[in-house]
Amino acid sequence: MQIFNTLTGRKETFCPRDPGRVSIYVCGPTTYNFIHLGNARALVVFDTIRRYFLYKGYRVLYIQNFTDVDDKIINRSREEGIDPQTLAAKYVDEYFVDADALNVRRADVHPKVSDHIPEIIALITMIIDRGLAYVAGGDVYFAVRKFGGYGRLSKRSLDDLLAGARVEVGEQKRDPLDFALWKAAKPGEPWWESPWGRGRPGWHIECSAMALKYLGTGFDIHGGGADLIFPHHENEIAQSEGATGEPFARYWIHNGFITIREEKMSKSLGNVFLVRELTRLYPPEALRLFLLSNHYRNPLDYDPEAMEASVRAVNRLKTCLGLLRESLDRPAPDGDGGGGNRLEAVLEVLQGRFEAAMDDDFNTALAQAVMFDLTHEVNTYLHQNDRPSRGALQKALDLFDAFNRVLGIFPEHKGRIVLEAGAVSGDLSQGLLDLLIALRQDARRNKDFATADRIRDGLRALGILLEDTPQGVRWKKT
């Protein structure tokens, strides 16, 4: 298995710290709002990476934190007029609603900053004792110039960093490059007692303390979005290795940005999309499929056309799965109309291609392509054989489930895909469906075939297939 390591700037063969086990720490959200599409990409990417290690037979210890002590939380709580910890707890709960919708599995541990203040204070004390941090007016700062190798993750020199560094009003740090490990208490902000007075931790030290507590030094993989490379992850390395004298994490994995019609997603442009909003517009399976549709290190551009394509793609997968299950459930004698052995041979090739794609730095775009090749092979086989081999079909279904256990497109129970039951998919009510069918019939009678086709195609994208028969219009789920 090859993994691109941001630290070295190249692909490396993965070799775990402990044979047969993988330790992963992923920076989770700051809980001051609902998660947006950029947050979701990181969640889905690293959930998929974890799933693939499990598929390969590894035992995985997966940690994803919640930053529930932060300036953004304090500012948002003032706007809403509630306590910062109440606000943070609210958005932790909301995170799980969105994560569940995207079929993101729970981490083994979801540590919160507020529950780990003693560990944070102990780590800061170690850094001070090693001469790499200093106290100034109740604040504690990391002395960047005293740590050799600072900048090696982000590939930045101290001179480059100094050009963009600044000292905020009220800060007492000795060097513009230094960063806060502990911040003295201010009126109206949460605080904890410490050897340096009342205060709260800086952002970067929080993740170091939690990662070291649950995974120890030299753990396997540290992940997050590319926006965290500097300063967050650079500072994590400095303070963690400064405290322990040992390597912090061995492989650093960063997912690329989400763009909106090739523009950066930002509040100022008004193009920040919340997962909660998008899952009301599109099936969550389609959103997850979209988030895995490009290599994780590359930018991923969002637009409605791309999402509609993902909806159609998910429906193709559902149709194939339905045909497989229907064929296996049908009370018919087993047969082989001349293709079962060939299909089984193709399945082996497809499994090899899928694993090769994921082994090559978790290339989910290629892995998805293999999954769609599987649907093509199954559809072709069923079309060409009146008496298909049940053994071959069962192997195809098993492979479909195996691919899904990695990509996580559909929810699963005991390793098998679970599709939601119901007369009509999504938020489409029976009454609305009847109305759309009636409008399409009116359009056809008026020879407005463009409108009729648009309604038909729109319903197909929502998982409803219309059939025109002499007895009238019939519909079925795809």
From Swiss-Prot:
A motif ('KMSKS' region) lies at residues 264-268. It catalyses: tRNA(Cys) + L-cysteine + ATP = L-cysteinyl-tRNA(Cys) + AMP + diphosphate. Keywords: Aminoacyl-tRNA synthetase, ATP-binding, Cytoplasm, Ligase, Metal-binding, Nucleotide-binding, Protein biosynthesis, Zinc. A motif ('HIGH' region) lies at residues 29-39. GO terms for cellular component: cytosol. It is found in: Cytoplasm. ATP binds at K267. This is Cysteine--tRNA ligase. It comes from Desulforudis audaxviator (strain MP104C). The lineage of its organism: Bacteria, Bacillati, Bacillota, Clostridia, Thermoanaerobacterales. The gene is cysS.
